[in-house]
Amino acid sequence: IAAYATAWQTCCSALKPITMSGLPDFLRSHTYPVLPAGISAAVLAAIAAFVVGLILMRLSGIAASISTLAALFILNVVYSNWDKVTMGTASIVGLPTYVTPWIAFAVAGLAMVIAYIFQKSSWGLALRATREDEVAARASGISVYWMRLAAFTLSGLVMGMAGVLHAHFLGTISVDTFFRRLTFITLTMLVVGGMRSLSGAVLGVVVISFVTDILRRMESGVSVSAQE
């Protein structure tokens, strides 16, 4: 959501009337600076997470997981067929590529700081209580529904920031960019590192990224002395 939102705002205004004619006039006819575009796109992702979370956070366990995955598939179908707004399955190109690895590292560090502060706050403690023992959390006066909704919305904001960075790092996006491959790689990172701690999530990212990079290099063959 955030990647497409920033693309609508920063893509060349000469191309949008042709390739994305269904956009509102204030998006179709104008190009906005990358910083306000990125911030507004991340906020839009948080709002979308809040709206979807109003329904999903009433579920728990495997039902919540399946419903969240179903929401991803529904969004993919909508974006894949919304030709006049998202260009369907085609790629949106010409985005300004202002994101460098150092900028990405800085924002990733900011995301970890936000997660750490939330983890150590009273809200983080209450959220962990809803995970460990939902009945006891309710008995303690914790609103399980609203705590989970707040965490889901905050996650939407952080993932929106990631989508903006991804779009302006590659300079092009498509619906396939954010579908099955990226989803399952992200889940794999969490499973490998551990989903119950911030350090585990970071470790999972490092390990899977390292393994992925090694395997990508091996695709072209491994050099042994002067021969491959």
Where in this protein do the model-derived segments appear?
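Transmembrane alpha-helices and adjacent helix-loop boundaries
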Residues: I1-E228
